[in-house]
Swiss-Prot record:
GO terms of biological process kind: action potential; adrenergic receptor signaling pathway; atrial cardiac muscle cell action potential; auditory receptor cell development; cardiac conduction; cardiac muscle contraction; cellular response to cAMP; cellular response to epinephrine stimulus
Region named Interaction with KCNE1 C-terminus: 535-572
UniProt note on regulation of activity: PIP2 molecule is essential to activate KCNQ channels by inducing the coupling of the voltage-sensing domain (VSD) and the pore-forming domain (PD). Upon channel activation, PIP2 disrupts the VSD-calmodulin/CALM interactions, causing the release of CALM from the VSD which triggers the opening of the gate. Calcium potentiates KCNQ1 channel current through calcium-bound CALM. Calcium-bound CALM competes with PIP2 to stabilize the channel open state.
Region called Interaction with AKAP9, residue ranges: 588-616
Localization per Swiss-Prot or TrEMBL: Cell membrane; Cytoplasmic vesicle membrane; Early endosome; Membrane raft
GO molecular function: calmodulin binding; delayed rectifier potassium channel activity; identical protein binding; outward rectifier potassium channel activity; phosphatidylinositol-4,5-bisphosphate binding; potassium channel activity; protein kinase A catalytic subunit binding; protein kinase A regulatory subunit binding
UniProt PTM comment: Phosphorylation at Ser-27 by PKA; increases delayed rectifier potassium channel activity of the KCNQ1-KCNE1 complex through a macromolecular complex that includes PKA, PP1, and the targeting protein AKAP9.
Descriptive protein name: Potassium voltage-gated channel subfamily KQT member 1
Source organism of this protein record: Rattus norvegicus (Rat)
Gene: Kcnq1
Segments crossing the lipid bilayer: 121-142, 154-176, 193-218, 227-242, 261-283, 323-348
Gene3D superfamilies assigned to the protein according to its UniProt record, in alphabetical order: 1.10.287.70, 6.10.140.1910, Voltage-gated potassium channels. Chain C (1.20.120.350)
Region (C-terminal assembly domain (tetramerization)): 589-620
């Protein structure tokens, strides 16, 4: 292949190599199947752009990247496909053009922005729409006042045009973005989305506004009396603010929870209303007021008076005239008004309980990530003792295949591209974008000095020159001789670190460091979980203490039951009959009773043995007919007393008393 060939010729040559190895799809397929590939290189013999071969590591025919391009020599077939050389990540062919966002991704973002607003941007947008709708409603009200009709009508006309265009466009965009969800895909899915109540309201508002603008004459809104009835449709725009219906769901949940109390109070209040109104009608149906007119001429008038009274409005158009009617009305007011006021208190307490429940739910939701982090860190601490390779794979950076362009003066890219590339690398290594608490660091190691790469990397050369400024600051040989030691220290400090790409490259100090980091992360997660578990209200503290007290009492009862089962009941309050029954059991009390019985029997036998030994001693000393009392008297007269004669009956003799023969008084003298 000619080194000065044009890019089309080079492309045809690449296609030829691809056909030799198999069918290909794009440059990526060729890179996987061909043992070497061609890259763009500037600064050729003609000053134009040529294609330079990039061969795998160790392949023959590889030249330095900045040298003139040479003809490629195919690598041996047994080497197989290998990743190409990474020259400069700033000029990757994937970053030369903007990444194309998928259609479903754009639909999802638009749908979340319009239908699921979160964040300050969504808040600003929807709040601005609410203000515009409110201003339009105010001008619609002012257009009915003769004093402001001229100003409000003209302004309202142009505001209606803007709002119709805006809401119509937004309706179409909402209908289009709903396709990101599976149940709204296709025509039937869009129709299902359009059948939602809030979508029907939006469509009615847009159509009603278009009818008002089209039928109006001389540029004035609501010019004819036939269109005045459509004005109330403008109020439906206020429903546009709460598209999710959170307000109505909250009200419905409160009413549903307290439905029994509400039904009871309303039922009793309604009964009090109809009975009291009927009694007032009977008392006031013939009464005439000062103007000579009967105020309670029908039962409907009495019901109207009752409704106005129990709702504490009191228009004063109907007033009882007789004392009987006034008495009935006073009793009715005290009784019925209290029942009609109860629903307000019930709903208020229900809303307060609902808010408290949501706060507790939020407080509980904060514990979920903390608990998950604690479980994760605890498991990682446990897995660190396992020598399996999967434990350490998260710390190994996968070798990313980079496709680069050769350029003598590459332009630095924006930081956005760097962030996107970093995000892609993290995603390839199994990291989720939301994992911000415990980031897994990638481990680097010093490359061995005796290992030399088979290729020349411009990126490594540029980084080494950039990170070693002392090589560029050398002025005289004398400076080199006097500062050789300092230069060696600088070069040692500027050693390039290579990322670890395989588990086998991890050493013992790497694993020990990982274990220490995991243990520190475990303690941090434990502390955060304990902080998240702290109660935020006094009621929660009381509830927690009561629950703990209940658990403590249950454990104490269980311990007492086990003690009674093992030791037995206290013998102080047990009668003898129950003790005899308990002797056959295996409790500690029964065993102690049996041991005490055995000790008593042994004591009795030892007493018998002691008496027998005394008799033997007496036989050895003075004969069988010697009396102890006479021996005591005789011994007392001689001035010596034999101590063996005063041994207690329940005491045992010593070993010397049993073995050493006693000497008489004559022998002792």
């Amino acid at each position: 292949m000619d080194t000065a060939s044009s890019p089309p010729n080079a492309e045809r040559k690449r296609a030829g190599w691809g056909r030799l190895l198999g069918a290909r799809r794009g440059s990526a397929g060729l890179a996987k199947k061909c043992p070497f590939s061609l890259e763009l290189a500037e600064g050729g013999p003609t000053g134009g752009t040529v294609y330079a071969p990039i061969a795998p590591t160790g392949a023959p025919g590889l030249a330095p990247p900045m040298s003139p391009p040479v003809s490629p020599v195919p690598a041996p077939a047994d080497l197989g496909p290998r990743p190409r050389v990474s020259l400069d990540p700033r000029v990757s062919i994937y970053s030369t053009r903007r990444p194309l966002l998928a259609r479903t991704h754009i639909q999802g973002r638009v749908y979340n922005f319009l239908e699921r607003p979160t964040g300050w941007k969504c808040f600003v947008y929807h709040f601005t729409v609410f203000l515009i709708v409110l201003v339009c409603l105010i001008f619609s009200v002012l257009s009915t006042i003769e004093q402001y009709a001229a100003l409000a009508t003209g302004t309202l006309f142009w505001m209606e045009i803007v709002l119709v265009v805006f809401f119509g466009t937004e309706y179409v965009v909402r209908l289009w973005s709903a396709g990101c969800r599976s149940k709204y895909v296709g025509i039937w899915g869009r129709l299902r989305f359009a059948r939602k109540p809030i979508s029907i309201i939006d469509l009615i508002v847009v159509v009603a506004s278009m009818v008002v603008l089209c039928v109006g004459s001389k540029g004035q809104v609501f010019a004819t009396s036939a269109i005045r009835g459509i004005r109330f449709l403008q109020i439906l725009r206020m429903l546009h603010v709460d598209r999710q219906g959170g307000t109505w769901r909250l009200l419905g949940s409160v009413v549903f929870i307290h439905r029994q109390e509400l039904i009871t109070t309303l039922y009793i209040g309604f009964l009090g209303l109809i009975f009291s109104s009927y009694f007032v009608y009977l008392a006031e149906k013939d009464a005439v007021n000062e103007s000579g007119r009967i105020e309670f001429g029908s039962y409907a008038d009495a019901l109207w008076w009752g409704v106005v009274t129990v709702t504490t409005i009191g228009y004063g158009d109907k007033v009882p005239q007789t004392w009987v009617g006034k008495t009935i009305a006073s009793c009715f007011s005290v009784f019925a008004i209290s029942f009609f006021a109860l629903p307000a208190g019930i709903l208020g307490s229900g809303f307060a309980l609902k808010v408290q429940q949501k706060q507790r739910q939020k407080h509980f939701n904060r514990q979920i990530p903390a608990a998950a982090s604690l479980i994760q860190t605890a498991w990682r601490c446990y897995a660190a003792e396992n020598p399996d390779s999967s434990t350490w794979k998260i710390y190994v950076r996968k070798p990313a295949r980079s496709h680069t362009l050769l350029s003598p003066s590459p332009k630095p890219k924006k930081s956005v591209m760097v962030k996107k590339k970093k995000f892609k690398l993290d995603k390839d290594n199994g990291l989720s974008p939301g994992e911000k608490i415990f980031n897994v660091p990638h481990i680097t190691c010093d490359p061995p000095e005796d290992r030399r790469p088979d290729h020349f990397s411009i990126d490594g050369y540029d980084s080494s020159v950039r990170k070693s400024p002392t090589l560029l600051e050398v002025s005289t040989p004398h400076f080199l001789r006097t500062n050789s030691f300092a230069e060696d220290l600088d070069l040692e400090g500027e050693t390039l670190l290579t990322p670890i790409t395989h588990v086998s490259q991890l050493r013992d100090h790497h694993r020990a460091t990982i274990k220490v980091i995991r243990r520190m992360q475990y303690f941090v997660a434990k502390k955060k979980f304990q902080q998240a578990r702290k109660p935020y209200d006094v009621r929660d503290v009381i509830e927690q203490y009561s629950q703990g007290h209940l658990n403590l009492m249950v454990r104490i009862k269980e311990l007492q039951r086990r003690l009674d089962q093992s030791i037995g009941k206290p013998s102080l309050f047990i009668p003898i009959s129950e003790k005899s029954k308990d002797r056959g059991s295996n409790t500690i009390g029964a065993r102690l009773n049996r041991v005490e019985d055995k000790v008593t029997q042994l004591d009795q036998r030892l007493v018998i043995i002691t008496d027998m030994l005394h008799q033997l001693l007496s036989l050895q000393q003075g004969g069988p007919t010697c009396n102890n009392r006479s021996q005591v008297v005789a011994s007392d007269e001689r001035g010596s007393i034999n101590p063996e004669l005063f041994l207690p009956s329940n005491s045992l003799p010593t070993y010397e008393q049993l073995t050493v023969p006693q000497t008489g008084p004559d022998e002792g003298s």
